[in-house]
């Protein structure tokens, strides 16, 4: 609960401001990460070098996200064919362990994500897929509410609600308030994907009808709603089924199947949930692939087809170590972290905060785009206006807070 409080605070004072900055650069330039900075920067400056950081961040994100996205497809198939029918909590946990222990299974579903993702981008049907995904996301939002209500009604769920929503400051002090705050800051950056140009690519297609402050609030509010509702599904269910809340990413693959199994028509609800999650994760895959493709086309002058043919094997081969890190290479440690944890650290602990600092300085510094031009772009359109008096916070406090995240993550 203390983490959640910090998370909400940092979304407000860090997340929304940086989102407006990335959106502003994208909408004003109508370009990809590197070309966007090159279009807006003062002549002769090197802000556009940040595009290489964005390119690296997108690549590293994809070489582990495609593996996790493959888990979604795998679980959809397992629910669809009835593999979970009649399972108890221990067997559900064993199913997840068996999945990650099988390198061929992980590589197959990862490869399926990579192949289909690049095929969609190569065929130019990403926008058509986006329309389908929007409908699926509305369905997912409705299903999340249903699952949250169901979790809250489970016997023994009250302890999970207390753990999630009632702050335990003594426990937070034991863990270190600074550590909790830094983790919440990292989570705010990661959930919004700010700092590596993803929002900039999205904004390059945006109209100028609405102010970017309002757009940033709406994006953050929707993201926060999903995150909070996910907590209301998972933590009460953890309490009800005796699953430790500290199990991390596997929670969705251990706790939720238990919820579905104990629901009427559980196979249907489980299949529906994981097909929605598959579309959600796959939309992220195609969006980041589009970012990679767009950057390479702009930077190297390649055609779309050539770019896809070059990137596909690089992403596929680059993703194999993450898949093997759960089994064949499970003993491999890099600075005390497993392969997935190290790749996640590079993105959420290093590239995202570093990129966010660059966006912040570019938008407020007279040696970059400048605060006045940034503010003019943010306030273009109807909706919430960004006040000029906020400039000192954006110029001095915001970069220092982001720097704290970066330094804390490296310690």
Regions found by a protein language model. Give the residues of each.
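Select transmembrane alpha-helical segments in multipass membrane proteins
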Residues: 2-6, 46-59, 107-113, 173-185, ...
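Juxtamembrane transmembrane-helix boundary signature
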Residues: 6-42, 66, 237, 241-244, ...
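Inter-helical loop and helix-membrane interface segments of multi-pass membrane transporters/permeases
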Residues: 31-53, 66-126, 155-182, 247-253, ...
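Helix-loop-helix connectors at the membrane interface of multi-pass transporters/channels
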Residues: 35-36, 69-101, 204-209, 214-226, ...
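Membrane-water interface regions at transmembrane-helix termini and the short interhelical loops
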Residues: 46-62, 97-99, 112-136, 201-209, ...
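C-terminal membrane-solvent junction of multi-pass transporters and transport-like membrane proteins
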Residues: 50-55, 292, 299-312, 344-402
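Loop-to-transmembrane helix boundary motifs in multi-pass membrane proteins
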Residues: 103, 107-108, 222-229, 267-270, ...
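Membrane-embedded translocation segments of transport machinery
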Residues: 130, 134-282, 306-307, 314
């Amino acid at each position: 609960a203390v983490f959640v409080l910090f998370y909400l605070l940092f979304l407000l004072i860090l997340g929304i401001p940086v989102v407006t900055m990335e959106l502003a650069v994208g909408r004003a330039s109508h370009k990809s990460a590197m070309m966007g900075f090159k279009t807006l920067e003062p002549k002769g400056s090197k802000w556009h070098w940040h595009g290489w950081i964005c390119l690296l961040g997108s690549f590293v994100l994809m070489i582990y996200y495609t593996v996790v996205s493959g888990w979604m497809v795998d679980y959809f198939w397992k629910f669809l064919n009835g593999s979970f029918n009649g399972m108890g909590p221990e067997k559900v946990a064993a199913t997840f362990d068996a999945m990650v222990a099988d390198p061929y299974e992980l590589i197959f579903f990862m490869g399926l994500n990579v192949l289909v993702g690049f095929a969609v981008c190569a065929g130019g049907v990403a926008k058509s897929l986006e329309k389908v995904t929007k409908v699926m996301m509305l369905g997912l939002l409705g299903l999340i509410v249903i699952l949250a209500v169901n979790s809250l009604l489970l016997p023994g769920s009250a302890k999970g609600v207390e753990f999630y929503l009632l702050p335990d400051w003594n426990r937070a002090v034991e863990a270190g308030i600074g550590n909790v705050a830094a983790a919440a800051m990292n989570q705010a950056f990661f959930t919004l994907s700010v700092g590596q140009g993803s929002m900039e690519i999205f904004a390059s297609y945006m109209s100028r009808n609405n102010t970017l402050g309002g757009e940033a609030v709406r994006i953050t509010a929707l993201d926060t709603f999903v995150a909070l509702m996910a907590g209301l599904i998972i933590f009460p269910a953890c309490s009800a089924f005796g699953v430790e809340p500290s199990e991390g990413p596997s929670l969705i693959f251990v706790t939720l199947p238990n919820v579905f199994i104990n629901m009427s028509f559980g196979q249907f609800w489980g299949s529906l949930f994981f097909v929605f999650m598959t579309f959600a994760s796959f939309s992220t895959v195609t969006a980041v692939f589009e970012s990679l493709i767009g950057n390479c086309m702009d930077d190297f002058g390649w055609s779309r087809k050539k770019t896809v043919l070059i990137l596909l094997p690089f992403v596929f081969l680059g993703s194999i170590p993450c898949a093997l890190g759960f089994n064949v290479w499970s003993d491999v440690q890099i600075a005390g972290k497993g392969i997935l944890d190290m790749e996640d650290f590079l993105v959420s602990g290093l590239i995202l905060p570093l990129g966010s600092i660059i966006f912040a300085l570019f938008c407020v510094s007279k040696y970059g785009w400048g605060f006045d031009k940034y503010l003019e772009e943010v306030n273009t359109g109807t909706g919430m206006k960004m006040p000029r008096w906020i400039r000192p916070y954006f110029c001095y406090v915001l970069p220092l807070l982001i720097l704290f995240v970066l330094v804390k993550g490296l310690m």
